Amino acid sequence: MTELETAMGMIIDVFSRYSGSEGSTQTLTKGELKVLMEKELPGFLQSGKDKDAVDKLLKDLDANGDAQVDFSEFIVFVAAITSACHKYFEKAGLK
């Protein structure tokens, strides 16, 4: 597999690993999203002191209003974070 194919598979695996423990295997609940972020993106929540960060994130990601994050909504989040990191590293001259 190519590097990009491997990366895509890893994103799918991460979503699957955290979805389904509280509800459907096709979506992340608020609790599942929080655990995913704590384990996979610890710096994202750690830097903020806002206790409602996961609630706000869920509201922003939940395009269809079902109080859960499906894979399409999750991948938009991953793409946005990746884009922000890319811009940061370009500005820092680390690319």
UniProtKB/Swiss-Prot annotation:
Q: Which residues form the EF-hand domain?
A: 12-47, 49-84
Listed result of changing residue 64 to C: In S100Ppa; permanently active, interacts with EZR and PPP5C in absence of calcium
Q: What GO CC terms are in its UniProt record? A: cytoplasm; extracellular exosome; extracellular region; microvillus membrane; nucleoplasm; nucleus; secretory granule lumen
UniProt-listed Pfam families: S_100
In this chain, Ca(2+) 2 is annotated as bound at 62, 64, 66, 68, 73
Mutating residue 68 to K has which effect?
In S100Ppa; permanently active, interacts with EZR and PPP5C in absence of calcium
**Entry's CDD domains?**
S-100 (cd00213)
Which InterPro entries is this protein grouped with? EF-hand-dom_pair, EF_hand_dom, S-100_dom, S100/CaBP7/8-like_CS, S100_Ca-bd_sub
Q: Where does Ca(2+) 1 bind?
A: 25, 27, 32
Which terms under GO biological process does the entry name? endothelial cell migration
Domain of life, source organism: Eukaryota
Q: What is its main location?
A: nucleus
Q: How does it assemble?
A: Homodimer and heterodimer with S100A1. Interacts with S100PBP and S100Z. Interacts with CACYBP in a calcium-dependent manner. Dimeric form binds to and activates EZR/Ezrin by unmasking its F-actin binding sites. Interacts with PPP5C (via TPR repeats); the interaction is calcium-dependent and modulates PPP5C activity. (Microbial infection) Interacts with P.falciparum (strains 3D7 and FVO) MSP1 subunit p33; the interaction blocks S100P inflammatory and chemotactic activities.
**What is the protein's known function?**
May function as calcium sensor and contribute to cellular calcium signaling. In a calcium-dependent manner, functions by interacting with other proteins, such as EZR and PPP5C, and indirectly plays a role in physiological processes like the formation of microvilli in epithelial cells. May stimulate cell proliferation in an autocrine manner via activation of the receptor for activated glycation end products (RAGE).
What does the record's miscellaneous section state? This protein binds two calcium ions.
Name used for this protein in its record = Protein S100-P
Q: Which organism is it from?
A: Homo sapiens (Human)
Gene name per UniProt: S100P
